[in-house]
């Protein structure tokens, strides 16, 4: 089993490669996944938001999970599989399959169709980890799941599961606040976006479920080294650069209505690291080849170092 110490730094959450008919493009996905593994990332995961778990059937999820574990195993890269579902049994079935494949960890958000009652929280996580003994658990905490856990709820999950080692903290959750990050970091690793590493790193943030390490692994792995070394002054210009990318570079695409998967295809393709098709599945909007050219031009004019792979 992975330990808490293994769940640090930027774990690469690659987009899914779809072909022109929106079927899984296994060849393109393998190519990009192998390239990510060869960079020395601390781990890889799939079936989060960028991995479009919400836009595929169970048999497709199984195929993508199988390929991900196979490629990562071949390269000696730790691998985590997202198992989020709208119901407990769905998460359990995915957890059991991840264990069967030989994954190292699972990542799960709360079931999100109806907000969970506080009394259901511990039982849900106990059921999930009971289906994948020996695997580490990370929580994907997002307000898209309609509920944010309290510090006490995080601690209770830690105690009842015995394998909860990291939380992916997003906006409006406790891990994205300085005090909440400090308190959570006492017993689990807190992952936040790389642009927050210089501000929340001193509060204990130690890693990321990364959509940028496969845009420029050289830059993001260097930033991760600075994070582990607690070199806050050296880290700050890099996080400022990523803040500018988010606020300025991606602004035209935010105005178009793009969301996670479109952004993350777009950034990885704009730098030239990814080779897959920019398309993602509906309902949500896809990036286009023209968008890729537009973002690359902005990067060249404003953050040229991010194009240096």
Regions found by a protein language model. Give the residues of each.
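A general structural signal for well-ordered alpha-helical segments in protein cores
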Residues: 29, 61, 65, 91, ...
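Alpha-helical scaffold segments in soluble metabolic enzymes
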Residues: 67, 127, 156, 179, ...
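Active-site beta->alpha loop and helix N-cap motifs at the rims of alpha/beta catalytic domains
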Residues: 2-148
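A generic short alpha-helical patch detector that favors 3-5-residue windows
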Residues: 2, 6, 211-215, 256
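C-terminal alpha-helical cap/extension of soluble enzyme domains
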Residues: 6, 11-15, 39, 219-309
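A structural signal for short hydrophobic/aromatic patches embedded in well-ordered alpha helices
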Residues: 64, 124, 157, 235-238, ...
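Catalytic alpha/beta core domains of metabolic enzymes, predominantly
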Residues: 131-133, 142-251
């Amino acid at each position: 089993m992975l330990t808490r110490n293994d769940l640090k730094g930027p774990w690469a959450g690659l987009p899914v490669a779809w072909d022109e008919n929106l079927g899984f493009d296994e060849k393109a996905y393998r190519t990009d996944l192998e390239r990510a593994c060869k960079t020395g990332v601390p781990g890889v995961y799939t079936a989060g938001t960028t991995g479009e778990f919400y836009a595929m059937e169970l048999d497709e999820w199984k195929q993508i999970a199988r390929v991900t574990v196979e490629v990562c195993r071949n390269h000696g890269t730790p691998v985590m599989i997202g198992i989020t579902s709208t119901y407990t049994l769905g998460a359990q079935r995915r957890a059991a399959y991840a264990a069967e494949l030989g994954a190292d960890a699972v990542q799960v958000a709360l079931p999100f169709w109806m907000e969970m009652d506080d009394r259901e929280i511990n039982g849900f996580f106990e059921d999930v980890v009971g289906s994948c003994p020996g695997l580490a658990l990370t929580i994907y905490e997002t307000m898209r799941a309609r509920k944010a856990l309290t510090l006490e709820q995080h601690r209770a999950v830690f105690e009842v599961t015995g394998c909860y080692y990291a939380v992916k903290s997003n906006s409006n959750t406790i891990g994205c606040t300085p005090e909440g990050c400090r308190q959570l970091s006492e017993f689990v690793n807190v992952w936040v976006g790389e642009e927050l590493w210089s501000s929340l790193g001193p509060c204990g943030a130690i890693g990321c479920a990364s959509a940028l390490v496969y845009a420029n692994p050289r830059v993001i792995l260097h930033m991760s080294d600075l994070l582990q070394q607690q070199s806050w002054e050296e880290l700050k210009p890099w996080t400022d650069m990523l803040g500018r990318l988010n606020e300025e570079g991606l602004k035209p695409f935010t105005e178009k209505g793009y969301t996670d998967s479109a952004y993350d295809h777009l950034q990885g393709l704009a730098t030239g690291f990814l080779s897959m098709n920019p398309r993602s599945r509906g309902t949500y909007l896809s990036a286009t080849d023209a968008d890729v050219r537009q973002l690359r031009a902005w990067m060249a004019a404003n953050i040229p170092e991010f194009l240096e792979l």
